[in-house]
Swiss-Prot record:
Belongs to the metallo-dependent hydrolases superfamily. Phosphotriesterase family. Keywords: Hydrolase, Metal-binding. CDD domains: PTE. The keyword Metal-binding applies. A divalent metal cation 1 binds at residues 24, 26, 170, 299. Its EC number is 3.1.-.-. Its cofactor is a divalent metal cation. It comes from Nematostella vectensis (Starlet sea anemone). This is Phosphotriesterase-related protein. GO terms for biological process: catabolic process. GO terms for molecular function: hydrolase activity; zinc ion binding.
Amino acid sequence: MTSGMAQTVCGLLQPQKLGRTLTHEHMVMDYKSCYFKPSREQDLHLCSKKEITMQNLYWLRQNPYSNAFNLSLGDEPLEEIIAEVAEFKKEGGSTIVDNTTYGIMRNVEALKKISMATDVNIICGTGYYLDHTLPPEIKNAPIEELTQKMVNELTVGVEGTNIKCGVIGEVGCSWPLTPIEKKSLQASAAAQAETGAPLIIHPGRDESAPEEIIRILQEAGGDISRTVMSHTDRTIFNRSKLVELAATGCYVEWDLFGMETLFYQANLASDMPSDSQRIQDIKFLLDEGYEDKIVIAHDIHTRHRLKKYGGHGYAHIMVDIVPKMLMRGVTQEQIDKIQIANPRTWLTFK
């Protein structure tokens, strides 16, 4: 029985063994379906480069979705990504939730190899990503079929393996929601109700998106208290909206630590906050009394953010962010809640 347990790619785990947890990352994925043409015609020659160098690294930081090589993580052999995850372990990390779902090339067998090589607990996700990444057979499937596929991956195994998912999501949502994305949300809520699994959402890029998503989940029988709303740092810029979101009972996730860029390529109209601003917003929500509902991560989903290529890697929060949080008045007890207690509560099957 999964009730009262967490479920990793290597099997069931006592929740108290989860330790310091990154709640939203990717280790093995193909994000080429989310390619963006660069805004400058003269930069088109950089899109096909199959290497990351000192000469193109800054350009990639501003245009991460315009280079195919950058949009692939965890290529075989797995030594590159194993070394990156091992850095997280070395700095005191224990568990990573891989949010790669149907549409962006999840590979659960590779995740199990990474877990066994690094002794890091890895929890993989079931569910469906954004509309444009999904094939017609998924878009045309009834809710019941979408639900059953997720239930099977949570209780039986993924694609003929005995590797089971331990979370639903990240469930992809655009703004405005498309019909398949609404159907995916409804199916995710139904799968959560049936299995007791934790749920995590990728909201559309609008401050009203989380509110609409929560309403749909509630109407479909989802448990908001066991749901993470991802990407707060690129979605909500009004602190009153931030409090409204936390008041719904969901977990509020800042998951783009390390991503500091002048232009956020997926939404050029928004101003991506710095890590310092993320910490300030977290401190604000802590002071509002929501320390039990905050989780954090990096959402690494492009190669240039790995240490090998001059990026911050999976240990950035452990090495750089936690000390800065302490300097800004966040207590060690609050940090332990954010990194250990809150993820543990969320990841424990009901």
